[in-house]
Amino acid sequence: MSYEEDDWFSYRTEFNKRADSPRAAGNYDFESGNIDNIPLNDDGPLSPSQDFDLAGTLEEYESYDLRLSPNGGLNREDQQPGPSGNNDGQYHVMQNNDSFAQHMQSSNTIEYNSFEMPTVINSNHDVGPYQDLGIDDPNSFYANQQPSTSQGNDMIINENYEMMGPSTSYMPQIDHMNPSGNSSSQINHQQGMIVPQVQQQPAKPKTTKKRPPPKKKTAAQAPDTVGTVLTKVNKLTQQIDNNNDNQEQKIETRISAEDLVRVSALLSRLDVYQKEQAQGNNTHDQDIEALQAEIAQVFTKNMAMSANDAPGNSILSQIQNLTSIGSSASSSAQPSQPAKKAAPKRKTVPNTAKNLAQNQQIMPPQAQITPTKLVMDPPTTTMVPSSSQSNHMYSNDGFTTYNQMDEPGTSQQQQYNDYRQPPSQESMQYGHQQIIQARVVPSMNQKTHNYRQAVVFASPNTNGPSSQLQRPQSGMDQMQDQQYHAQDLQGSQVQQTFVSVQHDGQIYQEVEPTLRDFVRQGRYQGPQDAPHLRQQLITNVNATTNKQMVHRSQDPTPSPGNLQQFGEPLQRHGSYPHSHDMRPNSHSQSQHSYSNHYDGATEFFDVSMQHQDSQMSQIQPGSQHYVQQQELYHPIGDQQQMVEPESEYPVPQVTNELSEEELRAIMEEKRQIRQKRLKDIMIDQLNRLEEPVDVTPFRNKMDVLERLLPYHHFANEEEPVSDFDSTFQRVMDNAVHQANSIGNRIRNIVLRDTMRSSTEWEENMILFLETESERRKLEDDKKLADQDLSTFLRNSDIIQNVRARRLDVERTRLRVPRIPAHLKELDLQNGQLSSLYREYEFDSYDENRPRGSPFVYEEPESESESEPEAEPEPKKDNFAEPEPARGDISPLIGFPQLSPIPSPSRYRNESESTFDWKDEDESPLLSPETEKINKAADQFRKEIFGTQEDLDKSEPFPFEQISEAARNQHLITAQPQLPRVDASSIGSLASSSSTVDHSPQSIHPVFSPKAAIQSSSVQVMKPPRSPSSVSCKLSTPCVEQSLPEESHYEGSPEIDEDYDMSPIRENEPAELISLPISVNMIKKEKEDSTPKLKLRIPAAVLQNGIVASEDESDVAVEETIPAIRKPLKLRFNLKDIKLEEPSPDRDVASSRPKSRTEPPPTPEKLHVKIKASPAETTPTKLQLKEKSPAKTPVFKTPLQTPIKMTPSPSESRKRRSAKIEDSPAQKKKLLNSGSSFVTPKNGLRAELDETVERPLRIMTDGRKIVMKISKVSRNINHFVTPRRDKKGNLHKDLSPTNYTRLTMKLMKKKGELSVEFTETPNKNSEEDDHKIPNIPSTSTSIPPASTVVSSVSVKGRPAPASRKSSIDTAGKDKKGQLAKNKAAFCNRFNPFANVPSSKPSTSSAVSATPSTSSAVSAKLPTGKTPGRPVALSTPRSSHKPPQAVVAPRPNLIRTAPVVPKITVTNASESSLPSKSHIPIEVKPKLSSLLPWVSDTDESPEQKHKLKKTMPSINLLKVKTEPPEADAVTSKPESPRASSSMSFFEDAFLRSPKRSNEPLPVVEFSDDEENDLAHSTFSHATDHLLGTSNMNSSTNGSSSGLPWSTDP
């Protein structure tokens, strides 16, 4: 009988393709429409005794309730027609309640594929119906009915197959279902009866999923063979599927044996009528309708009685609609009865089956033949779908774990679940397959299926594995697979569904073509074809799939049903092992349990059983199963091992008799065996690696493991991983750089093209091309005329046009252009003119032949053009470095673009210029003027930075070799960017520039261009200020050119603009934005690791540009020679400081020492206005030695005095801001030019109450001082330096000690560096209140009274940030200080670094206690010139009058310590209520400008941040603010590089000129130079480290002092 291919074959490819590995489904891709899925007689022994013979009569199968789904599938299958069909192996396992429900539910959407999972209703006569299905609920629909194979009953039945084998009555049902028209001798009688039935049963499979567990369908009511019946059923199912398009509702109805027999008879009669009607003999429409009505009535009655009332009702309602046959009801009914409950009795003849029965009137029985055979296969398929078959496949393959024969319900449910997702398409496919399956096994339970496989297949298909054999294997495999899948997948059901689908699909995919081709070609005429079809299928399977696949498929049989079976074996996880099926009840239940947990041992055991079963079944189905059995058996190596031990140790006595040597020999033998085994395994793995399976998807976890395990031979090297990041970053950076370069080039080209005002060269090119074309044509015509005149006349266009009067020769002659005058002068002969023209031809259309290239330098022509604009030497440099040549100005190099810059008038030379290759920073069409500017800028750069070679040198070109003017310019420009440089400090810097400039670090190549930019920009901004010989005009180009790079590098507002494509920018942006510190400087301070801009500026230059108006009202720093600076007026507000109040030094943010006072010889008076709040009870022992009003505010180390000497914020701000605004260069000078520094040691000897100058050089000679920060406040990231012990080693314990916790907060306040020292003195010692923190103070530190908090505004190097109290008291200030000036950075370590020592110690330093003050005074060298005591004009209400600062001792270096304003807040607990702040008001110059300056001097936040409970010493806050510009050192010291300029490394420190240098830049790490600095500053740093012996006064200094002075 010919099937309608479109009905069930067409869908296979569309939706049923499984993505599973080909082996997964036994190489059969079970698809509802796939003929490969058609169960064949050889699918496998339904029972040990019966072969599933399509030729057999339906009577043999009659006993089995055919649960034919409306699509011809078994009821269970109908219920889940699509899923079961698609998931061949899975549907077997899916007998659990969920799977049934799913199947039934999915049947609506997914047509039942009879072949996918023939609904084998396990008539568990031997076992409770629920057990086989695993249905625990007796009320469930399947409680009394055997689940349909579609729901995985088949798999359960595989376990139950053994039982089913005995239950021949059920087998006849299976046979009845499976007889695909092949009337076997056994079934012939029944076939006569059943073929009509089966043909009607195909309808019945749709409606009759009800299969009484009793094998009552054995009575074949029609002579039709099983094959015919199946064919009819399939045709009907196909019709229904086609009509319903997956709308068929497959309903399983429990039918009593009597009803089943009745239905079988009705179906057989219906089939007969349909056949007759098809043949056209008679029209039995009424009879067919009556039969269908009866069948529907039976099903309806049973459905009404069944637990699934809704499905039954839906079926009843849908029976009338053949298309919608209550598939939903059946599916729901099945879902209600999970496959697990072994209710194989569940006889659900879907209403679709009834409708089919009715439709079968239309459907000719002839279709039944092929379906019948197919039906036979579906029973086999049912077995195959069962986990056992899947397991067989896997077991044979050795994939016992892969047996997807999950619990019957589980696998089927999984299948159905998987395929419910694509229900519509699959349902159609499944419906078609289901038809076949319905014919084959739709009514069969797994038992029935197994039994039929064993019995039915036994006779026709001896090769097929006996159902019994398959049962144990399937049962075991199912359990194993289920267990494995349960672990492997979400559940055995799901696993089965997924895996089996994949496996089945793949297996079927490989096998499908064969079976499909066979069916399509031979049309699979019926049971007679079944054996051949099956054999062909098996053969094809063998050919297309490996033995494992074949074995899996052979487990049931490689018929379409077998294909399904194969799918299930692939689904072994979800499928039921045959062995389990042999134990239907226990298997269904156990499989469910196993599905949840995989039992490897059980699986292997099952595998062996499966092998045995497979072998037995193979005897019938064929060698394939046999091979599978072998493979399955092999996995059970344990058995052999067990045998070996027995042979080795047959008797314990023998074991006892074995001597040690013998035992050793045995062990050695075993070891060798094991070694060999391992070697073989490894070799096998290596062989697998040679031929990896990389195409098919993984079937399951075991497949993943097996496939991937061999790869362990490949070692995973760490190296590629370790350096990947860096390599990738490097490569990507390079790629990005190249891409940007190319993009810039393109942009420049486009820009030039856009900017071109003339298209002359393009026109010339076009004209030339046109002329050249005409010329060549003319030459060709001439040649032709000379050679072959006739041809020429015949073919010439000219002649033709002339003849046609289209060309007027005379007129053309007249229009010929005359020879140019310059050519007329030449007496050219005929051939000479063209040759002369050739000289002007374009080469390759390159009108600009001498095109500039980054790789090849301009030809002499272009050079000559550029030479007038750029010096040849620059050119050489430029050409020496092609990249510089690309940019008009190379910011890094600082040379103007030397490549010829075509002016707009030079059209041809435009392309010649290297602009094609220039980068973004180039400006394309530079006019000659611009080029001149660039040239001048280049010269300027050369003066400042030296030639490119010099810039390339590791050390920057020494400033000594730079013109003074250049230095001044750069300093002036850079100064605004140095917030902490005061005018005075700039002056000092100028004085010390000589020493500074030679240090290579002073000019860092990276910063040099920027510095130049800054200087130039600053000069442009403040031209009067810069006495530089270089004109601002020159500097401007330099600035502009370098600015682009600066902007890229720093991102400062002046530099931010991108100048790449445009001519050099004006200096306006720089003028507009004059930051106290260049943004790049700030960034550098943030990043300690960033290269330092080391610009050494001659003091003279700074002084020239400095406006030293140091009055309180001075907002701007007047340009004055630092030596002539006005005395700093420091306004000290001595106020009682509450313990909680941090010294309001924030306001007096210690900006970079604004003025580095010149050498001590000319101490400048520091006018400090001390406003002492009368509340201060503790007398401030601030002895101001007013030897000379030194501008440099003394670094006041307040002894426990609550008096807080802070310069009035307004004044300090004014001063700072004015200085910063007016001359940042001055600031830098001041910073750099502290000739005499006071060491941060306790400069004040309490006894003497005078500051003792300490030669700074001793302290810092030849090394960078490493200050340790006890606790870095979060706000000073850039100031954080690892704390070091006295030896300079990093201190492990960063937390300050309880007793000596000097928290130094270095904050930028109003542009000044404010250092707040919050010292937690030794709680045990009262002295702490009187201890002077050895905060670097100007030459005289005033030991304030115990409660005196002195805030000294020193325009000098800010106090070391390391001494900043790390506590958040100064948190805001810290934030402000995030703007990190290098100067500030250096200052944080050494407040004296940049403070001009010329400033006399301000009188603000009062020795609170004679002991401390003397110690401090003696040990703290006064950086200020001794003649410059700062008079503290502080109302000392309750404070001890500040002691006059002792003149620095002659032996000390008279370097005015460039101590930034240091606000020392020493709040003693006693003085908390009446703490007077002595704020030194430094005019806030930077505060307004510096974004980082956050708080005012007395910011309550700071105070609150300070430990409120601390004694005044604990609250000792030293805010070092740059000294007033007024403090001018009498003799300019070689300016120390402003701290900002030299962050860590100051080459100047190492420079020989540094003898009188102020404290060099403090570095994190110890210098290679001697540890003198550390030893000197050890106390200062130790307290920060918490390792200091501060509690015990060091060198006579009270333990509370922040710095103890070493003698």
UniProtKB/Swiss-Prot annotation:
Q: Where is this region: Disordered?
A: 14-52, 67-93, 167-222, 326-425, 459-478, 549-594, 845-931, 1017-1061, 1141-1241, 1319-1378, 1392-1445, 1517-1607
GO biological process terms on file? amine metabolic process
Q: In which tissues is it expressed?
A: Expressed in gonad distal tip cells and gonad sheath cells.
GO cellular component, as recorded: cytoplasm; nucleus
Locations listed in the record = Nucleus; Cytoplasm
Basic residues biased stretches = 206-218
Residue stretches of biased makeup (Polar residues): 81-93, 179-191, 349-371, 379-425
Name the source's superkingdom: Eukaryota
This protein's record includes keyword Iron: no
| Consequences of knocking out this gene | Embryonic lethal. RNAi-mediated knockdown results in gonad distal tip cell (DTC) migration defects whereby DTCs do not migrate to the midbody of the hermaphrodite and as a consequence this leads to abnormal gonadal arm formation during gonad morphogenesis. RNAi-mediated knockdown specifically in gonad DTCs also result in a DTC migration defect in which DTCs migrate away from the hermaphrodite midbody on the dorsal basement membrane. RNAi-mediated knockdown in a unc-6 mutant background results in failed gonad DTC migration to the midbody of the hermaphrodite.
Q: Which GO terms describe its molecular function?
A: copper ion binding; primary methylamine oxidase activity; quinone binding
Task: List compositional bias (Basic and acidic residues) regions by residue number.
Answer: 872-886, 907-917
| Major subcellular location class | nucleus
Q: Where is the composition biased (Acidic residues)?
A: 858-871
Composition bias of kind Low complexity appears in: 195-205, 327-341, 585-594, 1333-1354, 1395-1419, 1584-1601
Question: What keywords tag this UniProt record?
Answer: Cytoplasm, Developmental protein, Nucleus
- Pfam families assigned to the protein according to its UniProt record, in alphabetical order: GLTSCR1 (PF15249)
Biological role stated in the UniProt entry: During gonad development, involved in distal tip cell (DTC) migration from the dorsal side of the hermaphrodite body to the midbody which allows for the formation of gonad arms. Role in gonad DTC migration may be in association with integrin related proteins ina-1 and mig-15.
Query: Can you name this protein?
Result: Abnormal cell migration protein 38
